[in-house]
A protein has these predicted regions:
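Conserved, structured core segments of small domains
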Residues: 1-103
């Protein structure tokens, strides 16, 4: 099944403004993860003004629906978003388990 990257550009004061919507945003993310649509998600580490969410679904609809229903988008915390198809080159459907300290 294809992968799709949902990319958020956040407002400059994202950290302060997200507090009112964070619980609902995380609930939505956990529900999508439980449905096996959302694979992983989080803020971009070099800046709190962006986020990346990776979806695994038949088409871009799951990622687009997530964004349209996300309180961060609805309330202007995410100033814009886009969904891009993502081609996985290394990795597969089977999760790898790593032991601590071993690569």
């Amino acid at each position: 099944m294809p992968y799709f990257a949902l990319i958020y550009d956040m407002v400059d004061d994202f950290v302060a403004r997200r507090a009112a919507y964070r619980d609902e945003h995380l609930r939505l993310a956990r529900e999508s993860y439980a449905r096996c649509q959302l694979v992983l998600a989080g803020a971009l580490a070099d800046s709190p003004a962006g986020a990346l969410l990776v979806f695994n679904s038949a088409d871009a609809t799951a990622a687009e629906d997530f964004a349209r229903n996300d309180p961060y988008v609805k309330n202007g915390v995410a100033k814009q978003w886009k969904v891009r198809p993502w081609t996985v080159v290394v990795g597969n459907e089977e999760p790898r388990v790593r032991s601590a300290g071993k690569d």
